[in-house]
Regions:
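Soluble metallo-hydrolase cores and metallopeptidase-like ectodomains found primarily
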Residues: 28-30, 111-114, 123-152, 158, ...
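Bacterial N-terminal signal peptides that target proteins for export
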Residues: 1-11
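Noncatalytic luminal/extracellular "stalk/propeptide" segments of secretory-pathway proteins
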Residues: 23-27, 49, 53-220
């Protein structure tokens, strides 16, 4: 909690800002009121507690997701927003949720195993007991190489797996923890981010023609350069291959699949999907990720030709057919330019090992809080401000893509709808609970002077970094893909990438309250300025239609 004395130190520099030549005029008095409301009367952690403690996790299209969505819609109505509704899209795929699970090692010694099921796994129909078999399957993101390696695997293991729990990874000595798990950007790191000479050129090679990096550390940069059409194709190829593997294991009569995740350490588990969420594809065999230390123990025991027996139970609720999901929408009507819209948003869905607090309950809570601040202050805004809380992000940006396609245009054909001309811009938050340090321009350099001016009142909070760089993996890309201004904020990493991302530690306790309060203030101020700017936000040239890429 910030003291009132520190509050005055935060606010004083705003009134000393010189008028910058060529930059937009700022309503510094209003920004001061926004800061006061965001810090002294914050509700952001209350929003987050409801989303994570009570309604988390929120797997897309699950009953838990819809319960959380109804709560969020109710909170938006309570704040006083207009046109609040759940906007259906789909079909998505199966609804799936885990109601109970346990994994225990019975031999050579008893041990309860810290585990999490992978989504769209089948139930065990009660506890089942069996021996494990070590049949490691190599992992690679290169679809061609993965398919070749699976063909070899199939030939080697056909007829040898029936009635077994298959352990899909070998034993591995954990990497040394040489870096701190919790990190805030230094001034030097922010300067390096800001100094990027240009946004990364996209690699428009076909998926089959891509040259994959040998160094896993280079994969992040490699993925960053993939256009959405290629990334979507890659994602589909990975899911298709996972489905083929699951069919093989089902045909072989395995009892279940066990694995470790290389991201898991110190007792955490990281869990996503076992395969396809489509009802046309079978549910995977009961599939679990086990914390690395326990999994490695089991694998080392098996390497000593010693039997490992486990008892596994998994009860899931899954729909027989594909179902729709929904986005949560609400707005504050504008004034003289009410037909024009400024949007904010965050993905609302989560994975299921934790409660979805930092990914992305934090972003959703901040955006709800932004709307509360603007509504509470009863500020006058020329343009309508609309919030979108998206589902299906974790499975492929499905919810925001569906919304953009329905309202603004189709990224595949670039056939644009009338409302495309009326959306000024979209602002997104989805990188954990770390404080905002600036913004990615997403290659839109015409936005630089606007963001520099809008973020200047937050210089004391060190939130003024502006970089031409792109960032990916979240919902602003759905807007950018049809030529609409879409932006994601730069955030301190904290322990998001090292501990909480898609893990059992993604809980309320890992969220940073003061950082989320500050994020609420920053975004509310930016949105207010965008909503009252004389012109709409500048746009980049329209991208190529995905069909032409």
């Amino acid at each position: 909690m910030l003291t009132s004395g520190f509050r005055k130190q935060l606010l004083l520099p705003m009134f000393l800002l010189p008028a910058a030549w060529g930059q937009p005029k700022l309503d510094l008095g209003l920004v001061s009121r926004i800061k006061t409301e965001a810090f002294d009367h914050s509700k952001v952690m209350d929003h987050l507690s409801w989303l994570s403690d009570v309604y988390g996790p929120r797997l897309t299209a699950s009953p838990e997701f819809f319960q959380a969505a109804e709560w969020a819609a109710g909170r938006l109505r309570e704040i006083g927003l207009s046109n609040v509704h759940l906007e259906s899209w789909g079909p998505f795929g199966r609804s799936w949720s885990a109601e109970q699970w346990s994994v225990e090692m019975l031999e050579p010694r008893y041990a309860p195993l810290n585990s999490a099921p992978l989504a769209w796994s089948a139930s065990t129909n009660g506890p089942i007991t069996g021996e494990t078999i070590l049949a490691p399957l190599k992992r690679t993101f290169d679809p061609k190489k993965a398919r070749e390696e699976f063909a070899v695997y199939r030939k080697e293991w056909t007829g040898k797996l029936r009635g077994k729990f298959v352990m899909l990874r070998d034993a591995k000595i954990p990497d040394e923890q040489t870096k701190a798990q919790f990190h805030r950007y230094t001034d030097a790191e922010l300067a390096e981010i800001a100094a990027a000479p240009e946004h990364a050129a996209k690699n428009y090679a076909k998926l089959a023609d891509l040259t994959w990096p040998d160094d896993p550390a280079e994969l992040g940069k490699f993925f960053q350069r993939l256009p959405e059409t290629v990334f979507d194709e890659l994602f589909d190829a990975i899911v298709q291959l996972a489905t083929e593997r699951n069919r093989f294991f089902l045909d072989e009569g395995v009892l279940g699949l066990l694995m470790r995740d290389d991201r898991s350490h110190d007792g955490t588990t990281n869990a996503e999907a076992a395969g396809s969420h489509k009802s046309a594809d079978p549910l995977a065999p009961p599939t679990f990720v086990i914390t690395a230390e326990q999994y490695n123990r089991m694998a080392r025991v098996m390497e000593k030709k010693t039997t490992v027996r486990v008892r596994v139970s998994l009860k899931v609720k899954a729909s027989d057919a594909d179902v729709n999901s929904a986005n949560i929408i609400g707005e504050i009507p504008g004034g003289k330019k009410a037909d024009q819209v400024v949007m904010i948003g965050a993905h609302f869905d989560s994975w299921h090992a934790g409660t979805g607090a930092t990914d992305n309950g934090a972003g959703s809570a901040v955006m709800i809080e932004v709307m509360r601040i603007l509504k509470t202050l009863n500020v006058s805004m020329d343009r309508t401000v609309r919030i979108g809380l998206w589902s299906g992000e974790e499975e492929g940006l499905y919810g925001s893509e569906a919304y953009v396609k329905q309202h603004f245009g189709d990224a595949k054909t670039l056939k644009l709808l009338p409302d495309h001309a009326k959306l000024s811009g979209y602002f997104n938050l989805d990188n954990g609970s770390g404080k905002i340090r600036g913004v990615y321009l997403q290659g839109n350099d015409a936005m630089r002077p606007l963001f520099e001016a809008w973020l200047e009142p937050f210089r004391d909070e060190n939130a003024t970094t502006v970089t031409i760089k792109d960032t990916g993996g979240t919902d602003h890309l759905s807007f950018d893909a049809v030529g609409l201004p879409g932006f994601q904020f730069i955030q301190d990493p904290l322990d998001y990438g090292t501990v909480t991302h898609h893990s059992s530690m993604d809980t309320y306790d890992h969220a940073a309250p003061s950082d989320l309060m500050e994020a609420s203030a920053v975004i509310a101020a930016v949105v207010y300025q965008a909503a009252n700017r004389a012109e709409m936000l500048p746009r980049k040239e329209l991208p190529k239609a995905r069909e032409q890429q």
